[in-house]
Amino acid sequence: MFQLPVNNLGSLRKARKTVKKILSDIGLEYCKEHIEDFKQFEPNDFYLKNTTWEDVGLWDPSLTKNQDYRTKPFCCSACPFSSKFFSAYKSHFRNVHSEDFENRILLNCPYCTFNADKKTLETHIKIFHAPNASAPSSSLSTFKDKNKNDGLKPKQADSVEQAVYYCKKCTYRDPLYEIVRKHIYREHFQHVAAPYIAKAGEKSLNGAVPLGSNAREESSIHCKRCLFMPKSYEALVQHVIEDHERIGYQVTAMIGHTNVVVPRSKPLMLIAPKPQDKKSMGLPPRIGSLASGNVRSLPSQQMVNRLSIPKPNLNSTGVNMMSSVHLQQNNYGVKSVGQGYSVGQSMRLGLGGNAPVSIPQQSQSVKQLLPSGNGRSYGLGSEQRSQAPARYSLQSANASSLSSGQLKSPSLSQSQASRVLGQSSSKPAAAATGPPPGNTSSTQKWKICTICNELFPENVYSVHFEKEHKAEKVPAVANYIMKIHNFTSKCLYCNRYLPTDTLLNHMLIHGLSCPYCRSTFNDVEKMAAHMRMVHIDEEMGPKTDSTLSFDLTLQQGSHTNIHLLVTTYNLRDAPAESVAYHAQNNPPVPPKPQPKVQEKADIPVKSSPQAAVPYKKDVGKTLCPLCFSILKGPISDALAHHLRERHQVIQTVHPVEKKLTYKCIHCLGVYTSNMTASTITLHLVHCRGVGKTQNGQDKTNAPSRLNQSPSLAPVKRTYEQMEFPLLKKRKLDDDSDSPSFFEEKPEEPVVLALDPKGHEDDSYEARKSFLTKYFNKQPYPTRREIEKLAASLWLWKSDIASHFSNKRKKCVRDCEKYKPGVLLGFNMKELNKVKHEMDFDAEWLFENHDEKDSRVNASKTADKKLNLGKEDDSSSDSFENLEEESNESGSPFDPVFEVEPKISNDNPEEHVLKVIPEDASESEEKLDQKEDGSKYETIHLTEEPTKLMHNASDSEVDQDDVVEWKDGASPSESGPGSQQVSDFEDNTCEMKPGTWSDESSQSEDARSSKPAAKKKATMQGDREQLKWKNSSYGKVEGFWSKDQSQWKNASENDERLSNPQIEWQNSTIDSEDGEQFDNMTDGVAEPMHGSLAGVKLSSQQA
């Protein structure tokens, strides 16, 4: 634990297993060599047999399994798990060993490679990484006395927290993100960039001079694949990683961020040395004092690197520049002693690598900035500037270092300076007598000219570059870039931090927008040409704190210098339509930010690129920072709608970190700035606001629409009807100052069929069973229902969707396999009295006749009619035999048949029966004369269609014949009781339904005093006919397409009539078996009963 950090841990861990094996072999050889020497001390067999491990010690090695050595750095102490990455180890510990997660998990030290649990790591940091306290108080009384003496002074603790970035792979750390990123490029990605690097000493750089370019030794290298010539080795490595390998996310993942306790810095004193101190040395003594009192606590080697970048150019010339003029302490170490500067006088000053950051901002030590000869404050007005019209610039030595410069004589006129500086000169008197400008942006930002290598204040630099180098000023807008500080910006599309040197290339990927017409360009040259042609007379708006400037030199044709001014997103001057603005300022009543500025900016529409164009009208492709999906449409609307619908968050600003982040739309909880999409998923599982009504913000934004809709469906219909008025209102509200209340469509709440609350902690099978219950209630869930179920049950959406899909497929397979039938428990007679929209077939449409004859067995009648239509010449003989048998049995009535003697075999479908019903009085007279012989005829006629249909089921079905048959005799074309006439009247037969009347009067015979056997036979016949009717419903073409030569002759029935009762019972048993009806086609009864007009079937539609 208390050892110094060991390097090359990977190599040591790989060799450790081999070392253990070698040591074990050496020990085994030693034991074999000395076994003879210790034999005299060996006990006898009695003690060996009666001694166990428990007699020696409590630990039995035979009960434990020898665990293999784990070469990965993060090893779990409770199980054999090990991982190379700390994130995987942490996830394993959280999921498997969550009972004591905080105290048992290994944590990595942010300063070195030491890993330990929480308590041990705290001790480790206190011993090895504790800051040096400056002067701790001896006792509490002295501390109180000190506070009493310094009561008027501001309280300062001995130490403060400093935010630093650190490399997760080594001990390197730095307060600047860019420095740590460059370190990773140089130290940890050499193997990635090595195949792409090529030496090109004979090739020179292109004419473009990038920002801060230096004459370094790496300038002779270039990329093999695309011939990219970088300004440094780190730039080439970044180019390879970003453009060719596309593994930039790995670099981002290797950079960590933490807060370090460092001692509070003392005021920095940069006293000019005496003239006799001029001598050549590697490091001036002043830098040593700077390292001890700097704001950041850095290792000595890193501080030297920061203050002397680049290393090769820190020579005697650079040191001499530190001590050429007597200077006193100022914010930048610059203050005059004499009356003024002569024209030829030169003044040199040594600054840190990034002077505005490394030098502390002590406003009490700042008195004047670049004063004139009479000691007057350097005002921004032209009157104060007149006595010292000097341009102060710091020129770097050898055109290489940003940290050293020379103060030169000026050539800038008074009018040129007042043009740029006059923006802040409205109150010159207040500027002269007011507080010192130590905290203003103009005193904190210096820029170096990339062409003449001179250092300027930022407000003077833009005018210098435009006038001296004939630079063309090109304005642009990139509202997706948030400027963090001078060296780092954040892309709101990609949710990535970008350094200054790669920011322009990244913005060109998304596109820069014209501030006047909102055209998007991915090339600076095309944008500059667009400005020259279209907006040549337009005036530039005032420069804000969020403006980024880039100096470029184009090589097309002649050298063209371009000063690109990009207006980025800033919360302070964001328009009212900004989503992040509303997230940061979210009182119940929407505020009106900057009303005066907006009114002035709306009059000259093209003068201000930031305020004139509303933020929400940026039209283009938007990239979601959470799921990286491409969104099309207005940037603000599309991104806000996507975040709300897909991720259920809205943009806001973190109240502590002051960074752009998101908050939950259900519970209004704010996520941290380094959250991901998986963080939202985990939160939604346990969010208490999910499923409740929308939050108060949505109710205030759209109170009328939410009150109008009591249920889900009216909301959608109401919104569709109000779509065009709402669009019109949006357009009117965009022009006004107040923010629009109709900015977002309110999200309709999801109503679940079953409440999944309480099932998230159940087992996997229990949650699946809940989904099955939900499927029985709602088999077709919507997308949002699936998302809500996934969030509530802690399941993947794909699992839930596949579960519902499998259930639906199983239902379909079961329906096809088991052929389920739906029993309609309707009283059809009563149903016909009611007006309804149900459409029944002609078979089930009954007329309201008397109670006794309301139910007519239509299928039995159809069977008789089918038996009557025979094709062969023997059919007439069969009818004669039937008449003879009926006469012998004593039947008093004779059925009359008119049969066409010759029927064509080609068209058996044309053989259609024509029914001529008799009067009701005649049928009643015949009912009284019925005897036993007629019942046998009834039994035989009942049996006959069953056999015929059993034979007809073997034939193939012809769909065309069915259609033609239905067209010939459609039941819907005739009224109730009308005569059905087919299209082929030539092949028809006519008969009088005397026998049918006999069949329809079986109910009276059942009530009469007949034998029990006859009653039983009649009841079984009715059940048989009903079963045949249900099984043969829907198709009749199998019967009608049967060749008439295959139909059975009536002579075959003569023998059956001799013993009708036995054969009828056998046929009844066969029909009850049901197997023969499974092969029968459906739909026989519909067309067949439709042709029977005299059986009290109604063809009217209900």
Curated annotation (Swiss-Prot):
So which domain of life are we looking at? Eukaryota
Q: Which residues bind DNA?
A: 754-814
Mark out the compositionally biased spans (Polar residues).
692-711, 971-982, 1058-1069
As stated in the Swiss-Prot or TrEMBL entry, residues carrying the post-translational modification Phosphoserine are: 98, 409, 413, 608, 709, 736, 738, 805, 876, 878, 886, 889, 921, 953, 955, 1071
Locate the N6-acetyllysine modifications and list their residues: 1035, 1042
- Where do the record's region annotations for Neuroprotective peptide (NAP) lie? 354-361
Q: Which residues carry this modification: Asymmetric dimethylarginine?
A: 348
Cellular compartments annotated: Nucleus; Chromosome
A biological process from GO: neuron apoptotic process
Q: Which GO terms describe its cellular component?
A: axon; chromatin; dendrite; extracellular space; neuronal cell body; nucleus; RNA polymerase II transcription regulator complex
**Which parts form a coiled-coil structure per UniProt?**
none
In what ranges is there compositional bias, type Basic and acidic residues?
851-873, 899-947
Q: Where are the zinc fingers (C2H2-type)?
A: 74-97, 107-129, 165-188, 221-244, 447-469, 489-510, 512-535, 622-647, 662-686
Q: By its UniProt entry, which Pfam families does this protein fall under? A: ADNP_N, Homeodomain
InterPro entries (alphabetical): ADNP/ADNP2 (IPR038861), ADNP_Znf (IPR045762), HD (IPR001356), Homeodomain-like_sf (IPR009057), Znf_C2H2_type (IPR013087)
SUPFAM superfamilies from the UniProt entry: Homeodomain-like
* Subunit (UniProt): Interacts (via N-terminal region) with beta-catenin/CTNNB1 (via the central armadillo domains); interaction is direct and stabilizes CTNNB1 by modulating its phosphorylation by glycogen synthase kinase-3 beta GSK3B.
* Further details from the record: When isolated from the sequence, neuroprotective peptide (NAP) provides neuroprotection against the amyloid-beta peptide.
Q: Which disease is it linked to?
A: Helsmoortel-van der Aa syndrome: A disorder characterized by intellectual disability, autism spectrum disorder, and dysmorphic facial features including prominent forehead, high hairline, downslanting palpebral fissures, notched eyelids, broad nasal bridge, thin upper lip, and smooth philtrum.
Q: What is this protein called?
A: Activity-dependent neuroprotector homeobox protein
**Native source organism of the sequence:** Homo sapiens
Tell me the organism's taxonomic lineage: Eukaryota, Metazoa, Chordata, Craniata, Vertebrata
